[in-house]
């Protein structure tokens, strides 16, 4: 089951948070605030960087449907780009030349060495650190995941050489949370205890399925039911799921939308009261 689309209805959610959210596919989001600022989370266009895209094509028949992309003028209007971690489906080095150097780049610790050495404005951040970008306070928060980018057996590997995490955008007392890749852990409650209730939560629901290593996959990727529990821990006023879909490489899932089907099933089974807003790639919502 591929090339699907969500055709259901979303509830009317009037929370006046002042955020406009566009899902570009997989983990990529464009966020606009009520004062006209613009932010990007994990922008990745097309397929992985070389040589991983080439290697992936050799061992898998799964390809990515081209995701929604931004125009050059939209990229030029971006105040800051935030990356959650260094994995190929969240950071594409080849995209940097298209994004340009007008924006600030906020990254986890150890990330800057993966950028070209020619003028990019990069701020590396530790967990629970903050940076003011215009009128928006940006917080880097923990996630239960890992990092790696390069592995040549017996020669080089960079496992956990860079940090990983999620992000909180805070503007005029309203907060938007982007989880990054993560498994479920007490860190969600820790984030709520430090920053308060979240208005908008962007939480992954996919990449948890593995026949060979089911326990490990779930440790580092939330299932749909884990995501609902995390949203409750954060006291989210609305949750937007991501990670499934036509532009998500079907990684760790049986079909492109199996995670969304599971979310809908578990939402009813768990009697969750977290408001959901489901987007298709390219769609946006004002909250």
Placement of each model-derived feature along the sequence:
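Pre-active-site segment of Zn-dependent metallo-hydrolases
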Residues: 7-12, 36-82, 93-98, 148-152, ...
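Cap/insert and terminal regions of metallo-dependent hydrolase folds
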Residues: 110, 175, 183-280
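Active-site environment of divalent metal-dependent phosphoester hydrolases
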Residues: 46-48, 86-91, 112-115, 129-132, ...
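Active-site neighborhood of phospho(di)ester-bond hydrolases with catalytic His/Asp-centered motifs
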Residues: 40-42, 63, 77-86, 106-108, ...
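Active-site-proximal loop/helix segment associated with metal-binding centers of metalloenzymes
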Residues: 46-53, 140-173, 186, 195, ...
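Conserved beta-strand hairpin/beta-sheet module of binuclear metal-dependent hydrolase folds
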Residues: 14-70, 160-180
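Short, polar loop motifs at secondary-structure junctions
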Residues: 25-26, 107-114, 126-128
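Active-site regions of enzymes building and remodeling cell-envelope glycoconjugates
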Residues: 118-125, 137-138
């Amino acid at each position: 089951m591929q090339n699907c689309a969500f055709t259901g209805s979303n509830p009317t959610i009037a929370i006046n948070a002042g955020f406009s959210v566009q899902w570009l596919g997989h983990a990529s989001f464009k966020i606009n605030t009520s004062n006209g600022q613009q932010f990007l989370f994990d922008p990745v266009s097309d397929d992985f960087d070389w040589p991983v895209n080439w290697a992936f094509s050799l061992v898998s028949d799964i390809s990515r449907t081209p995701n929604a992309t931004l125009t050059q003028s939209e990229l030029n209007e971006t105040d800051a780009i935030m990356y959650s971690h260094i994995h190929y489906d969240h950071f594409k080095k080849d995209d940097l030349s298209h994004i340009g150097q007008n924006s600030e780049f906020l990254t986890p610790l150890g990330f800057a060495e993966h950028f070209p050495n020619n003028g990019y404005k990069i701020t590396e951040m530790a967990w629970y650190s903050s940076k003011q970008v215009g009128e928006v306070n940006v917080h880097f928060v923990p996630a239960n995941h890992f990092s790696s980018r390069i592995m040549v057996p017996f020669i080089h590997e960079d496992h956990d050489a860079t940090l990983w995490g999620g992000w909180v955008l805070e503007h005029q007392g309203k907060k938007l949370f982007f989880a990054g890749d993560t498994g479920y852990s007490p860190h969600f409650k820790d984030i709520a205890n430090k920053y308060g209730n979240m208005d908008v939560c962007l939480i992954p629901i996919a990449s948890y399925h593995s026949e060979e290593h089911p326990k490990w996959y779930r440790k580092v990727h939330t299932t749909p039911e884990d995501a609902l529990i995390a949203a409750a821990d954060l006291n989210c006023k609305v949750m937007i799921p991501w990670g499934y879909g036509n532009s998500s490489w079907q990684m760790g899932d049986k079909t492109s939308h199996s995670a969304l089907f599971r979310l809908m099933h578990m939402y009813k089974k768990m009697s969750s009261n977290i408001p959901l807003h489901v987007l298709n790639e390219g769609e946006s919502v004002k909250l």
